[in-house]
């Protein structure tokens, strides 16, 4: 199956429409949204696309600005999703077990430092190492994330090193552990064009693309 995985729309409805139209042209069969959606118009497009979503840091503070229907949608979002062969999150899949949706986080805001829940993975940092270890222990080869507004990928090598990948097309090899940043639809910080990722789970191939 071929998926489009996108994140960080930040109220940019036109950019999201470009991504959705571009993805359809690529023969995409399913969508995932990794948070920081923004206004009601953008939420409506995500929901119309049938895209399972996770919440990002925008939703943590921005959900009260949505319509009542979309507030309920946002408050029910999880911080990460575990599919059969890949995981998806806004920033990290390592969350306290009692925080299973945005409403739980809102009820426990004083007890949870948000900086730990929304790390930036575009450089080699302790959070990235912790995620790689967690993926390896779970025998999970692939994580997609947003939040950094940059397209990039890291591979955990057999000799326990982190390798930053520079290609826009990446093949998931047997034994690999990959962390892939899909970039930003609405506010990319690594060049022009609305950025997102395509993943073909039959070919085991990731493409970092722009609409």
Where are these regions (language model features)?
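A structural micro-motif
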Residues: 1, 49-51, 141, 177, ...
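Beta-strand-turn-beta hairpins that frame and shape the catalytic cleft
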Residues: 1-4, 81-88, 172-179
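N-terminal active-site segment of His-dependent metallophosphoesterases
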Residues: 1-49
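Active-site neighborhood of phospho(di)ester-bond hydrolases with catalytic His/Asp-centered motifs
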Residues: 6-7, 30-36, 53-57, 89, ...
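Short, electropositive, low-hydrophobicity segments enriched in small/polar residues
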Residues: 11, 19, 39, 60, ...
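Conserved catalytic scaffold of divalent metal-dependent phosphoesterases
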Residues: 41-144, 148-158
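Acidic, His/Gly-rich catalytic cores of divalent-metal-dependent hydrolytic chemistry
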Residues: 155-211
């Amino acid at each position: 199956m071929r998926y489009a995985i996108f994140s960080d729309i930040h109220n940019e409805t036109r950019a999201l429409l470009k991504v959705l139209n571009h993805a359809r042209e690529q023969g995409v069969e399913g969508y995932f949204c990794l948070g920081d959606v923004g206004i009601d118009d953008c939420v409506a497009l995500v929901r119309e696309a049938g895209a399972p979503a996770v919440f990002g840091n925008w939703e943590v503070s921005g959900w009260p600005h949505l319509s009542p229907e979309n507030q309920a949608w946002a408050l029910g979002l999880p911080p990460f999703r575990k599919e059969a062969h890949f995981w998806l999150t806004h920033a990290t899949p390592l969350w306290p077990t009692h925080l299973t949706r945005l409403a739980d986080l809102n009820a426990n805001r004083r007890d949870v430092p948000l900086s730990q829940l929304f790390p930036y993975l575009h450089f080699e940092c302790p959070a990235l190492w912790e995620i790689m270890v967690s993926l390896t222990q779970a025998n999970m080869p692939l994580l997609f994330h947003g939040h950094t507004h940059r397209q990039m990928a890291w591979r955990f090598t057999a000799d326990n090193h982190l390798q930053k990948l520079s290609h826009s097309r990446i093949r998931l090899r047997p034994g690999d552990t990959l962390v892939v940043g899909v970039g930003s639809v609405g506010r990319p910080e690594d060049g022009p064009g609305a950025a997102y990722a395509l993943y073909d789970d039959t070919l085991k191939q990731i493409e970092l693309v722009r609409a």
